[in-house]
From Swiss-Prot:
Gene: ALS9
Phenotypic consequence of A63P: In allele ALS9-2
Protein name in UniProt: Agglutinin-like protein 9
Effect of V607F: In allele ALS9-1
Effect on the protein upon substituting L1238S: In allele ALS9-2
Lineage, uppermost ranks: Eukaryota, Fungi, Dikarya, Ascomycota, Saccharomycotina
UniProt feature, compositional bias: Basic and acidic residues: 1594-1603
Consequence of changing I325V: In allele ALS9-2
Length: 1890
């Protein structure tokens, strides 16, 4: 037993051990002590001593727990010990084993185990010293090469790891004093291998080695291990002259046990050849190596320098020192770190010691990236032998660039990383240009225009910015005047103008509303004068306190008192008085509490009074009954509760004790029922006579005879001669206990005395009296009581007798000394205690045990066990209590369990009844009680509000019963169109017309006429001009007077600042302007020249220049100007520019034009005039919105949405006396024709004009063209200008139009969405925006079977976001769809369930808006779901369900796969799935069709609709067969097939013997050679008969028993014959199985029904080819026929049978002519599936099949010659199926099915998709494809007829370059994906129709 217990203890200890971390918590020091003759402090030289601090906490560390210290780059431990203990105060708290890394791992480690200690501790800590040496290389092994890079000479950080705890210290390492240019030798002992590792590195050749010889030869006694040789070349050495890499090179080696020689050649410069090997040197004190050192450098130097070195050998005194073999093996384990262990080894038996390197499962880390801010990790574990994978998804940011000007002289770029988003900001600051005066004007265009007027050097440039009118915000204020006042504040462009209207005070009505935001909002609606202003204050909802009062009326009244914000609202509900139930509870507080719970009308109010617990007086009475009775009288609070317990009389046990008083005391203790009462009699102490004897035993004996009170007690002590030490302890009992521990002779006996309160020391003395005396000295508390016992010397023999008296008598007979005294004790008879026990027997047993006097006799009654009744109650404590009441035999035991009250969750539901219902579900303890309240539906009020978000939100607020539900719809604010009118009043009026959501609000502003401000400007003309600009209301009209420029006088001054300043003083017209230039002294050199102009000019020496636009202006107003001002319009162009002194490149990136038709005009007018510095370029383009799809090149796809024309022009002016003009214009109109006109003219100074024009047209290619582009390039060369040498503009527009194809069958989709692109400039700035798509989808599917007709689903998709990433895998076919509403068809037809959210990757569904269930009547139930559901999905599922109804077969057809891995949180149900399809890398589609017909399976579905309520839906399905079909797999796909499991089916596989036969024959003739190969394969099975039976409950009265038996083996024969003349393959086979089903009532006495099914499946396949010359016709025909015969017998003696027959035939014929192969295929398929309902009696079917234009011969099929061609064939199949069914009510039902199929096929790829649609991907030869669809009609006579409707799908493709890539996207892998043209066909349709 003890070994088993120890084994169990060991098992429990091992099984509960855990891994802890953080024990090693400090790296106190790392010091070096020189060993042997090492002369420098290198990391590899012994000995380094590491002092580490450790700490163990008893609360977290248990015996057997383990922890590990990882010591990177540590080679070994310099000690003969194998372990070290972690000790503190002499106690070993843990033992750590040394695991040296040596040549096996790149680190060493300590594997520690917590020891079991006998001392109690909270925390133990200390330090441990470890003598170590580091690994910095030494061989070419992978471990040494890795560790060779651990350290460098100088200061290093050494870090060890204990779990996540890292401890570090710094240390200085000396470099090797040996020169690295000479030869390098090294030898290092590996203790675990008992070998030395020797290294040789050839001396350095700086230019490389031509050839060389290296190696070494051992002396006698030392051997070389040729299996461990490393040869390589290292690119350099580390600071200790060890290789850091090992690369392959050309060499030959010769190795034996006595030497290794390597001959090498052609070593590149910078590399050093090396060789290392293991050397065994046991039992010798030293060994000598002779080194071969011969080499020729590439510079021609040849060195031959062999040498010899003596190494001291390694003497190992371990058990394996006698030459045992050590083998190193590698083993993969499931641990997380690498460890080294030595397997058990007995040197007397074993000859091989094995060192195992335990390596963890290798892990491959794959790093991916995405645009984001956080890094995620996903680990895919692997078993041993596999490789685990860790996918690290790292974020990267994209940038947006903001360019600003600053006062510095250089361009700076600063990147600001966004810590919370994925878009960083790059701020580019460029030097500010010359001083510029900016004039901002408003104009009527919708885009901005900037015109820069550049004055001569040292002047002030002007920038005229024309901005669209700012929106105006009108603010109305009230003042104390009686009239109105209007003030207009005009802000800069892109701002908002303000109009402040001061009106006399209107009365104001303030309305306060509450909303769901956490902040307050105030909106003021100001009406015109004499109106009433409104202030709408939106505040966060106040908390509401509802007070319910009762009044005398018979109806209810509710009064709501809404307080101001930040207050508390009150709802006063006055209700008719409800009846009140008062419940009084007790609680643990010392005060009373009263809680009133007022329920809704017609309810019952509750008053819960919590009172301090009343004291309870329990009175127990005994009565004559044999059972117990308890009566509890609970008094009101502040009273005393009474518990009257009536029990059968308990037996009484009387115990007599002694105490220190001089009188007697009797105490009666009455125990609970079924217990034993106690009577404690306390008597004065009797005198005690103690007789001590010595005997020959080695232990002591004490016998105590206690007499009744007034008697004399006797103690007979038999002791060995040992002394006794008495130890006194305290315990909780009220009496003393003495335990004597007798030790062997020569020991010390111990007496352990347990005393109440004070300890007692008992001293026994001998005296001369003849009687015993006991004296007790009682000391105060915390003292020690003394008992002095004086005993006579003689021993006493006591004899006890029983007598009839009721008291005890003691007679002592004292004999002379050396005699024996006698004590005769007479005792009254002992009381008897009867104990009743239960045992497993069925009868009763009584046993009587008689004890000595003053004892208690026992009667043990054993009874059969009583039954037990368990009662569970709730109480107010927070813990559970269990009380067991055991009654006498033949009674019933009670177990009373008191549990804390369960929490209660109240769920309110609405139902269709007009009254309320409350159901309370009380769960067992530790559960949650539920109260389900069902209320009539509340009326709903819908309120629509506007909010600041860009999307719509619907919030439903469901109020308690008898309330009103609210639906709050939050819509984005409507766009507002503001119309301003003038009127004759002196005040402003604003009228706001607010329309419903998705509309446009109107603001009509009526304003008084504006004042006028006159502004005078200068311009380059010689005459004056006046322009009147009329601004919107509340603005100021402007009159702009343009005057010729005043002459300017320029004054240049020097000042002490480091920057230049230019001040322009502009005088009124006809005056003289002044320019004052203040320049710093350096570094400006000013050269003054005279010229013919009337003004001064300063030209700075500019080394760099950069500007976003170029400008020009007239130098003088007197110069000759072209009278036409057509080209003077100021237009801006956005450019990104860079300059240097030699060239200038300007790259213009035009945004995408979002217009319908436009004209693009570019004009270049280069007039040249003196001075040469007046050069200007004016460019403009309109502004427009654009968004982007990623493009790999700077191109744009133009989208069109309206008919307005926007000109774009670029004009360059060069003023000179000789004029020349060049104009080029490109215009595109809605006719899609491009026109390009080029013209130029020379205009001499004499004003004569010679013009030459040419016109070029560029026509748009046909609509099927894949791509064309038009580029416009203009170029201007600077005129003798050193800082503007050359500027080049290039812009391009690419328009992509591709063909499309449409189908009228299957699926029709119309996508309306905006596609826009973004131009990516050289700074890789990327802007990604999303578009909104509205997709109405209508699908129609016909299966051709009467059980399924049509499904139509119309979904309104309100939000589709198409995402295109910059990098990574791109799938343009995916989208994230959120369906906000769905419309389902009416009852009686199949309901299609559209998923509420679809994603292509992992997605989370929270609070799904709806969940649809289909009942047996095919109705739709919508249940709101408030659970959180997480699903990993690769595809979406659209279940098509039609459940069982009378007279029809039930079938469930999912048309697509269902995702796996779904998890539902919040309900006990789980989601099981059956199929998964994964599509990667392409827009292909994988369709999996699973048709399931199961046998009487019960499917239960759980839906959580708002915790904790639970909705259960049970669907009963009937199925007889399972068929799985997978079709249409296009592109790269991964699919997991469905595995169908049914509990009622037996599992088994066909097994048997396969016998192959093959014969080959060849015959030669003059006509040629004929070869024949005959292959035959036979499969014969021997399947034993096996039967499976499944019994499950059917109804409340019957149960279903299903028995399936398979007993007929399956046989199959395959044969093939191949020859050069013909080939033939045949295959036959058949199988048969039977299924027996029966239903039996639960009492197994009534036979209900039985069904026998027999299934026979014969299959025949024949294939024959013939090869006549020159053409070969090949035909193939395969067929499969399945028959199912089902019969059913019921008690009513009715017979029910079903016959199922299906035929499938396919024929293939080919024609081969020369090397041209054309294919044609003929497909014939007829399927009939006919079943009936449970009530059907008879059934019959007739199938007719005809193939027009073809014969039905299997071996020689023919095709209608009029329809066959080289490109394919066409044929037709007409099938007619007629059925009739007779029901019990003699109602006849007949149906017929007619199907017609016609196919035309090219030798190209055919891809089939769901719903019968097909896609044919042809080359460039063009084709047509037609398919048929079935429509169904139902007549009133219960007949179903299917007729064929022809639908033609045609495609015409004309392209001159079919291989042109239409669009490119970047998938992150560097490849370009070519997308099929159908997608861009949709894009083209979009362009053509918007």
């Amino acid at each position: 037993m003890l070994p088993q217990f120890l084994l169990l203890l060991l098992y429990l200890t091992v099984s509960t051990a855990k891994t802890i971390t953080g024990v090693f918590n400090s790296f106190d020091s790392l010091t070096w002590t020189r060993s042997v003759e090492y002369v420098y402090k290198g990391p590899e030289t012994p000995t380094w001593t590491a002092v580490l601090g450790w700490s163990l906490n008893s609360t977290t560390a248990d015996a057997g727990d383990t922890f590990t210290l990882i010591m990177p780059c540590v080679f070994k431990f310099i000690t003969s010990q194998t372990s070290v203990d972690l000790t503190a105060d002499g106690v070993s708290y843990a033992t750590c084993d040394f695991n040296a890394g040596e040549e096996f791992t790149t680190f060493s480690s300590l594997s520690c185990t917590v020891n079991s200690v006998s001392v109690s501790y909270d925390k133990a800590s200390g330090t441990v010293k470890l003598p170590i040496t580091f690994n910095v290389g030494g061989t070419g092994s992978s471990v040494d090469l890795t560790d060779s890079k651990c350290f460098t000479a100088g200061k290093n950080t050494v870090t060890f790891m204990d779990g996540d705890t890292k401890i570090s210290t710094t240390v200085d390492f000396d470099a090797s004093p040996v020169s690295p240019s000479g030869y390098i030798t090294s030898s290092r002992i590996i203790p675990s291998l008992n070998k030395a590792s020797s290294l040789f590195v050839s001396p350095q050749c700086e230019n490389g080695y031509t050839s060389g010889i290296m190696g070494f030869v051992t002396s006698q006694g030392a051997t070389i291990d040729c299996s461990n040789i490393n040869i390589g070349i290292s690119k350099g050495l580390n600071d200790w002259n060890f290789p850091v890499s090992s690369e392959s090179f050309t060499y030959t080696k010769t190795c034996s046990s006595s030497g290794i020689i390597v001959e090498y050649e052609n070593v590149p410069a910078g590399y050093r050849p090396f060789v290392d090997a293991y050397i065994s040197s046991e039992n010798v004190e030293q060994y000598t190596l002779t080194y071969a050192n011969e080499y020729t450098c590439k510079n021609g130097n040849t060195v031959v320098d062999p040498f010899t070195l003596t190494w001291w050998g390694y003497k190992n005194s371990e058990a394996d020192s006698n030459g045992d073999i050590i083998v190193v093996t590698t083993k993969t384990v499931t641990a997380s770190t690498t460890a080294v262990t030595t397997l058990p080894f007995n040197p007397t038996v074993d000859k091989t010691e094995t060192i195992e390197v335990l390596q963890p499962i290798p892990t491959t880390t794959i790093t991916t990236s995405y645009i984001g801010i956080s890094t995620s990790y996903e680990t895919f574990t692997a078993t041993i032998g596999g490789t685990a994978t860790v996918i690290v998804d790292t974020p990267y940011h994209i940038t947006t660039t903001v360019t600003t000007f600053w006062t510095g002289s250089v361009t700076t770029t600063t990147t600001y990383s966004n810590p919370t988003g994925s878009i960083d900001t790059v701020i580019v600051q460029i030097p500010s240009p010359d001083p510029t005066t900016t004039i901002t004007e408003f104009w009527s265009e919708s885009f901005a225009s900037t015109t820069t007027v550049t004055n001569p050097p040292d002047g002030t440039n002007s920038v005229i910015i024309k901005e669209p009118y700012n929106p105006t915000v009108t603010t109305t204020e009230f003042w104390s005047e009686s009239f109105a006042s209007t003030t207009t504040i005009t802000n800069p462009p892109d701002g908002t103008n303000s109009v402040i209207v001061k009106e006399p005070y209107n009365p104001t009505v303030t309305t306060t509303e509450f909303w769901s935001e956490s902040f307050a909002s105030t909106t003021t609606v100001t009406n015109p004068p004499d109106g009433t202003n409104s202030v709408i204050i939106k505040e966060p909802y106040n908390p509401t306190v509802t007070t319910t009062e009762f009044w005398s009326e018979s109806f209810a009244s509710t009064t709501t008192i809404t307080n101001p914000p930040d207050g508390t609202n009150s709802v006063i509900v006055k209700e008719p008085y409800n009846p009140t139930v008062t419940t009084t509870e007790f609680w643990s507080e010392s005060f009373a509490s009263t809680t009133t719970v007022t329920n809704p009308p017609d309810g019952t109010n509750s008053v819960i009074i919590k009172e301090p617990y009343n004291p309870t007086v329990t009175t127990t009475e005994f009565w004559s009954e044999s059972f117990a009775s308890t009566t509890t009288i609970t008094n009101p609070p502040d009273g005393t509760n009474s518990v009257i317990v009536k029990e059968p009389y308990n037996p009484t046990v009387t115990t007599t004790e002694f105490w220190s008083e001089s009188f007697a005391s009797t105490t009666t203790i009455t125990n609970p029922p079924d217990g034993t009462n106690s009577v404690i009699v306390k008597e004065p102490y009797n005198p005690t006579v103690t007789t001590t004897e010595f005997w020959s035993e080695s232990f002591a004996s004490t016998t105590t005879i206690t007499n009744p009170p007034d008697g004399t007690n006797s103690v007979i002590v038999k002791e060995p001669y040992n002394p006794t030490v008495t130890t006194t302890e305290f315990w909780s009992e009220s009496f003393a206990s003495t335990t004597t521990i007798t030790n062997p002779p020569d020991g010390t006996n111990s007496v352990i005395v347990k005393e109440p309160y004070n300890p007692t020391v008992t001293t026994t003395e001998f005296w001369s009296e003849s009687f015993a005396s006991t004296t007790t000295v009682t000391n105060p508390p915390d003292g020690t009581n003394s008992v002095i016992v004086k005993e006579p010397y003689n021993p006493t023999v006591t004899t006890t007798e029983f007598w009839s008296e009721s008291f005890a008598s003691t007679t002592t007979i004292t004999n002379p000394p050396d005699g024996t005294n006698s004590v005769i004790v007479k005792e009254p008879y002992n009381p008897t205690v009867t104990t009743t026990e239960f045992w497993s027997e069925s009868f009763a047993s009584t046993t009587t045990i008689t004890n000595p006097p003053d004892g208690t006799n026992s009667v043990i009654v054993k009874e059969p066990y009583n039954p037990t009744v368990t009662t569970t109650e709730f109480w107010s404590e927070s813990f559970a209590s269990t009380t067991t009441i055991t009654n006498p035999p033949d009674g019933t035991n009670s177990v009373i369990i008191k549990e804390p009250y369960n929490p209660t969750v109240t769920t309110t539901e609405f139902w269709s009844e007009s009254f309320a219902s409350t159901t309370t579900i009380t769960n067992p303890p530790d559960g949650t009680n539920s109260v389900i309240i069902k209320e009539p539906y509340n009326p709903t009020v819908t309120t629509t509000e506007f909010w600041s978000e860009s999307f719509a939100s619907t919030t439903t607020v469901t109020n308690p019963p008898d309330g009103t539900n609210s639906v709050i719809i939050k819509e984005p604010y409507n766009p507002t169109v503001t119309t301003t009118e003038f009127w004759s009043e002196s005040f402003a009026s604003t009228t706001t017309v607010t329309n419903p959501p998705d509309g446009t609000n109107s603001v009509i502003i009526k304003e008084p006429y504006n004042p006028t401000v006159t502004t005078t400007e200068f311009w380059s003309e010689s005459f004056a001009s006046t322009t009147t600009v009329t601004n919107p209301p509340d603005g100021t009209n402007s009159v702009i007077v343009k005057e010729p420029y005043n002459p300017t006088v320029t004054t240049t001054e020097f000042w002490s600042e480091s920057f230049a300043s230019t001040t322009t003083v502009t005088n009124p017209p006809d005056g003289t302007n002044s320019v004052i230039i203040k320049e710093p002294y350096n570094p400006t050199v000013t050269t003054t020249e005279f010229w013919s102009e009337s003004f001064a000019s300063t030209t700075p020496s500019v080394s760099s220049f950069e500007s976003k636009t170029f400008y020009s202006s007239e130098a003088q107003s007197s110069l000759e100007i072209d009278s036409s001002n057509t080209f003077m319009t100021s237009i801006s162009v956005s450019t990104a520019s860079s300059y240097d002194e030699s060239s200038t490149i300007v790259s213009s990136a035009f945004p995408t034009l979002h217009i319908s038709s436009y004209s693009l005009s570019t004009s270049f007018v280069p007039p040249v005039t003196l001075p040469r510095y007046v050069n200007t370029t004016i460019s403009s383009s309109p502004s427009f919105e654009s968004s982007s799809m990623y493009s790999s090149v700077t191109s744009a796809v133009t989208s069109i949405d309206n008919d307005r024309e926007v000109p774009t022009s670029t004009t360059t002016y060069l003023h000179s006396k000789l004029y020349s003009e060049s104009i080029s214009t490109v215009i595109q109109t809605k006719s899609s024709d491009w026109s390009l006109s080029l013209g130029n003219s020379n205009k001499p100074e004499s004003a004569s004009t010679v013009s030459e024009e040419s016109l070029h047209y560029l026509s748009t290619p046909g609509p099927s063209s894949s791509e064309y582009s038009i580029s416009f390039t203009s170029e201007k060369e600077g005129h003798v200008s050193s800082y503007v040498p050359r500027v080049s503009y290039t812009s391009s527009v690419k328009v992509s139009i591709s063909s499309t194809m449409s189908s009228e069958n299957g699926m029709s989709a119309t996508h309306t969405f905006g596609i826009s692109t973004n131009t990516i400039p050289s700074s890789t700035e990327t802007s990604i925006k999303s578009a909104t798509v509205t997709t109405p989808v209508s699908e129609s599917t016909n299966t051709g079977m009467s059980i399924f007709m049509s499904t139509t689903t119309e979904s309104k998709t309100t939000d589709i976001t198409t995402e295109t990433s910059v990098s990574g895998e791109v799938n343009l076919g995916s989208a994230t769809v959120k369906v906000s509403s769905s419309e389902f068809i009416s009852k009686g037809t199949v309901t299609r369930i559209m998923p509420t959210e679809l994603t292509n990757s992992e997605s989370t569904f929270t609070a799904s808006p709806s969940f649809v269930l289909t009942s047996t009547e095919s109705s739709v139930i919508e249940t709101p779901a408030t659970i959180e559901m997480s699903s990993r999905s690769s595809s979406y599922s659209v279940p098509l369900s039609k459940l069982r109804s009378e007279g029809e077969t039930t079938r469930v057809i999912p048309t697509s796969s269902t995702a796996t891995g779904s998890t539902v949180i919040g309900s006990p149900s789980s989601v099981s799935t059956s199929n998964e399809s994964i599509i990667t890398g392409s827009s292909s589609f994988v369709s999996t069709t699973a048709e399931t017909i199961s046998t009487r399976s019960i499917v239960t579905e759980s839906i959580v609709a708002g915790s904790p309520s639970l909705v259960l839906t049970t669907t009963v399905l009937d199925t007889t067969e399972t068929t799985i079909t997978e079709t249409s797999i296009v592109g790269e796909s991964s699919s997991r097939s469905l595995t169908f499991k049914a509990s009622s089916l037996s599992k088994g596989e066909i097994t048997g013997t396969v016998t192959p036969e093959m014969s080959v024959s060849t015959s030669k003739a003059t006509t040629g050679t004929t070869s024949e190969v005959s292959i035959k394969e036979s499969l014969t099975t021997k399947v034993p008969t096996f039967t499976s039976t499944t019994i499950k409950p059917e109804t409340s009265e019957t149960q279903h028993s299903e028995s399936r038996t398979t007993q007929i083996p399956y046989s199959e024969t395959k044969g093939s014959q191949l020859s050069t003349a013909n080939s033939q393959v045949s295959q036959t086979g058949s199988s048969k199985s039977s299924i027996f089903e029966s239903a039996i009532s639960k009492d197994e006495s009534t036979f209900v029904s039985a069904t026998v099914k027999s299934i026979t499946t014969p299959a025949v396949t024949q294939y024959q080819t013939s090869l006549p010359n020159p053409a070969v016709s090949v035909s193939e025909e395969s067929g499969k026929k399945s028959s199912i015969i089902e019969s059913q017998t019921e008690n009513s003696a009715t017979q029910h049978s079903i016959y199922f027959d299906s035929i499938e035939t396919s024929t293939l014929s080919n024609t081969l002519a020369n090397t041209l192969v054309s294919g044609a295929m003929k497909n014939s398929e007829t399927t009939s599936e006919l079943t009936t309902s449970d009530k059907a009696i008879g059934f019959s079917t007739t199938t007719e099949t005809s193939i027009p234009g073809a014969t039905n011969s299997a071996l020689s099929p023919s095709v209608d010659s009029g329809k066959s061609s080289m490109l394919g064939w066409s044929g037709g199949i007409v099938s007619t199926v007629s059925t009739s069914t007779r029901l019990e009510d003699s109602t006849a039902t007949s149906s017929s099915i007619t199907a017609a199929n016609q196919d035309s096929l090219n030798p190209s790829t055919v891809s089939k998709y769901p719903h019968g649609s097909e896609t044919i991907d042809n080359g460039s030869n063009g084709s047509s494809h037609s398919s048929s669809a079935l429509a169904s009609t139902i007549s009133a006579s219960h007949s179903i007829k299917f007729s064929a409707h022809q639908t033609t799908l045609s495609q015409s493709l004309i392209s001159s370059s079919t291989k042109t890539v239409i669009a490119s996207t970047y998938d992150g892998s560097g490849s370009v994906i070519k997308l099929h043209s159908w997608f861009y066909g949709l894009v083209t349709i979009f362009f053509l129709f918007i």
